[in-house]
């Protein structure tokens, strides 16, 4: 066992040869390197698989022995300062390593087909392998300096991958936004690291925790300064994990390729903030009020992310806000001191969200056959619908991921989210009410995404992409399916079916119109597949290739079974709670005397309540988004109910308000753009003016004045000796007069 730990330092460096060799090959042998590009993808998967096997071996030893191994090398040693580098292997490291490698392997296999037609194929795999190296280095770091170094490398990789298609202005702006927003948090992280080093004199986690606990117990530190340093450390996690108020970069990060979105949202960048707080939790729990602040940020993010996801039309942005909300649950759990629940939800959410993003990538891939390569169209749920019969495997997989995120048993996220919800009652009833309500919102918006994408009819077939605006065959209501003015900000939730040119029918009309099958052929195919004797074209979406379906199906298995790792049933000598053994010892401020086991009655009571709330959200989504032309045959009762309802106008205003809030991202981006961006630009303009007119103006003015004085003197003198003598005696006379008055 000791020998296995001794070689653990190699974990972050195994994927590193791929980007180095790709860069060297493109520099020296570009033609040969590009012709063998599939070989580089195979090497990426192979090396990451070796890391996964190594991490699994470490995890098995962690479960059996609960040991912690740390090895350090001294780099700088003197009387006043010492700096060491090393690696730390503990349960948190092993969990994160398995998470990064398993999701990373699935994404790499998926990307081989997804990016096969892209000219940046090799660049993509180089970035991905470097991303894995950076994240693995982060989770194995033994001190704050290493954390910060790999933290910045993760940020650089995310910048490169979000802006992978940098020729698109939207993608270029998105990566800049992510980079700048994270710089705010990273600067706070750096200041926090320096602050705690100034307090304790150490960067190493073990020494840092021990020294700081002694200082706190002896009351030898300034609590206000310590709290400030802790908040600065937490600012790094706020930015990286897209917590309020530094969450604004996350939806724009969807401009990168879909496999990148899966990796960022499941196991790498956004998980880094959760990892940092979990790693520093022994430090935070002894600082007054910082845990309350962490839980407050978490609960705000939980609710804000859920409300912003309600009216998104872009399938990836809807999933992005879902990630933001779920990360809020993890941060809430850490703030409550429920270490196990937070990591449990990190694991289950990672696999479920990776499944959803890869499934959305499969949908986008199939939609591109109809609308061409245009993310605004291929990712727009307004143009989807009716994909069940075209992509049945993707549909089933996406449904399982959706139900998991909704908290439906026995899928993965049910077990972890339920644990956080139950712990929230012990911490704060107000936080608990918000968390449980958001669980219903989660079920609503996830079911909405599923219904708009897969149910009903294929809406893109009723659009005209010849460059002319054409009235669609029907419009789709309630924050997803709309008419021809898709980007109209004044769009309201008027639920109409537009028939022909002038005819209109109510959403609640009992007439069901049959769609002419001839209309399905009005779209010309945009994608043709060469390399065959005859050109094959598609007029319908089609299921993805096996290379893309294989990772999706593997993630389905994870979504089905990974939740059983943390089932807290330890009764009659049967120990099912593998996760608790894995995380021994762990921090739990809410159950200090508990052995992480509960009885069946208590569990079933809480589970029924949470499933009821989720089911209610699913029911509302089905009621609002289930296609009327395929479900409702007789709606006279609903029509009569709507006609006699005196509060319909008021309810429409509420719906429109919710829509505007979600569509405009809670007006937070607008606030930043209006006050921060404009203010900074005005400050920059003032600094430019001050620099040019004042700083440069003073020496330039002195030089210019000297020039004019010299010219005046030169013109007066004229080169005549009599003039020089006149000025000489004049100055001498003035000097003598001044001397006389000063001395007498």
From Swiss-Prot:
InterPro entries, alphabetized: NADH_UbQ_OxRdtase_chlpt_su5_C (IPR002128), NADHpl_OxRdtase_5_subgr (IPR018393), ND/Mrp_TM (IPR001750), NU5C-like (IPR003945), Proton_antipo_N (IPR001516)
One Pfam family of this chain: Proton_antipo_C
Keyword vocabulary terms for this entry: Chloroplast, Membrane, NAD, NADP, Plastid, Plastoquinone, Quinone, Thylakoid, Translocase, Transmembrane, Transmembrane helix, Transport
Membrane topology per record: Multi-pass membrane protein
Main location: plastid
Molecular-function annotations in GO: NADH dehydrogenase (ubiquinone) activity; quinone binding
Broad enzyme group: translocase
GO cellular component: chloroplast thylakoid membrane
Catalytic activity: a plastoquinone + NADH + (n+1) H(+)(in) = a plastoquinol + NAD(+) + n H(+)(out); a plastoquinone + NADPH + (n+1) H(+)(in) = a plastoquinol + NADP(+) + n H(+)(out)
Locations listed in the record: Plastid, Chloroplast thylakoid membrane
Entry EC number(s): 7.1.1.-
Gene Ontology biological process terms in this record: ATP synthesis coupled electron transport; electron transport coupled proton transport
Record has Transport as a keyword: yes
TM segment ranges: 9-29, 40-60, 89-109, 125-145, 147-167, 185-205, 219-239, 258-278, 290-312, 327-347, 354-374, 396-416, 425-445, 549-569, 608-628, 724-744
Task performed by this protein: NDH shuttles electrons from NAD(P)H:plastoquinone, via FMN and iron-sulfur (Fe-S) centers, to quinones in the photosynthetic chain and possibly in a chloroplast respiratory chain. The immediate electron acceptor for the enzyme in this species is believed to be plastoquinone. Couples the redox reaction to proton translocation, and thus conserves the redox energy in a proton gradient.
Membership in a protein family: Belongs to the complex I subunit 5 family.
Quaternary state and interactors: NDH is composed of at least 16 different subunits, 5 of which are encoded in the nucleus.
Protein name: NAD(P)H-quinone oxidoreductase subunit 5, chloroplastic
Organism: Adenocaulon himalaicum
Biological classification of the source: Eukaryota, Viridiplantae, Streptophyta, Embryophyta, Tracheophyta
